């Protein structure tokens, strides 16, 4: 088990190999960590964008298998606060961008898997 810091891309690059199956649990916790890096939300968003782009830049080239777990947070009531709304929006953007690069995407609700891709 490896606990990654905010630089998830670097952590994955350091441990990925053809013989590994890596389970990343969870992307929304990683997003939270990145958005709370600075009290100034605009600065935190810059940091988040850098980390997200770094992950998206390497994910297809990593050897082995990687399973990403995340929470779908955009299907319910979205709080009015700036940080909460940003979190929901950025989680959705991350899910879309990562899904476009993944070979298989499974949305699981109440233990029932729905294959969205692959």
Which residue ranges define each predicted feature?
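Conserved nucleotide-sensing/catalytic segment adjacent to the nucleotide-binding pocket
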Residues: 1-21, 26, 39
